[in-house]
Amino acid sequence: CIIGAGPSGITAAKNCQQNGIAYDIFEKNNKVGGNWVFNSATGHSSVYENTHIISSRTMSEYEDYPMPTTYPDYPRHDHLQAYFENYSKHFGVYENIKFHHTVDHVSKDSNGKWQVEYTDNQGNKHTKIYDYLMVSNGHHWMPKYPNYDGEFTGKWMHSHDFKGVTDEWRDKKILVIGAGNSGCDVAVESARVSKHIYISMRSPQWFVPKFMLGYPADILVKALEKLSPKTRQKL
């Protein structure tokens, strides 16, 4: 049993298929891609409207299924969603995905088998027993809310619910807590319309441009790793 038809789930299914292992793959959304399926409704963990991947195309593709060369160096979310869907179709996984199927509960029975309870696309409840379980739904699906002393009277939201800026953000002062991928994305996006944007971070971070010397930064860093430490220091 594979839970989730995102980037990890579909490659897990592909490897099962190539080794003659029967599997079911459950996906509660209507498309392949996991977080890369844009959905403007909050509640679904997804990218926001203008998301581009933070790693370059050649550093993000599957080794056995390259991304199209027509894609930009840093593809948009719709490029990624199409890429994952085409990957699943190319390797014969797509037709085995059970869309709009939600896994409700998983437990081990007395024989050490996995008992999976799920709801199908018609709203019917089922229970099925599996020898192995692969959880591939990612770790971004459940937002975590910190507790802070004091009182805040302005509007606040979790990045999980951020789908893009609206005119409501215009000329506002915005504080982003956290300098991870989501925090930096929200800061950059909101900077287009806000009056001031601040980032609060617990630990110091290096902010590196996406391009260096005309190349995607991660490709350049990978090339520099081949040089001796002494040569890298000189550079």
List each model region and its residues.
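Short secondary-structure boundary/capping segments
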Residues: 50-52, 89, 95, 125-126, ...
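Structural signal for conserved beta-strand scaffold positions within catalytic alpha/beta enzyme cores
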Residues: 61, 99, 105, 156-159, ...
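Beta1-alpha1 glycine-rich phosphate/pyrophosphate-binding loop at the start
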Residues: 2, 7-97, 201-204
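Residues that form ligand- and interface-recognition hot spots within folded domains
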Residues: 66, 120, 161
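A residue-level signal for beta-strand positions that form part of recognition/binding surfaces
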Residues: 59, 113, 154
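Rossmann-like dinucleotide-binding core of oxidoreductases
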Residues: 1-32, 37, 127-128, 133-235
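Feature captures the FAD/FMN-dependent oxidoreductase FAD-binding
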Residues: 70-141
